[in-house]
Amino acid sequence: MEMFNPPHPGEGVRAYMGDSITVSTLAKHLGMTRANLSMILNGRLGISASVAVKLSEAFPNSDPEFWLGMQVQYDLAQVRKKKRTKISPVLSKAA
């Protein structure tokens, strides 16, 4: 099975920012610290529901579900990449 490697949503934020919006400007506009926005942009911090709502308001051609969907896809891919003990079904098929 081929591994799906979705981008961190911070890459999507960068794309929406383009070259005309600075990190400081967007952070202030969203009411968050420059450090936290920078961590999102660099893939070190995830997007919460409240940040997703703010992003959808700042970039009206997006919606919160878009941002949270990117985050969920990224998170699931990270978990699937890790070596872990597989969990067996809790019920047998006969039940």
Over which residues does each language-model region extend?
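A short, Lys/Arg-rich alpha-helix, primarily the initiator
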Residues: 1-22, 65, 69
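Helix-turn-helix DNA-binding elements, focusing on the entry/boundary residues of the two helices
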Residues: 23, 34, 48-52
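Short alpha-helical "recognition helix" segments of helix-turn-helix
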Residues: 25-28, 37
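Short, basic-rich loop-to-helix N-cap that marks the start of a DNA-contacting helix
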Residues: 44-58
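Short, charged recognition helix plus adjacent turn
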Residues: 65-95
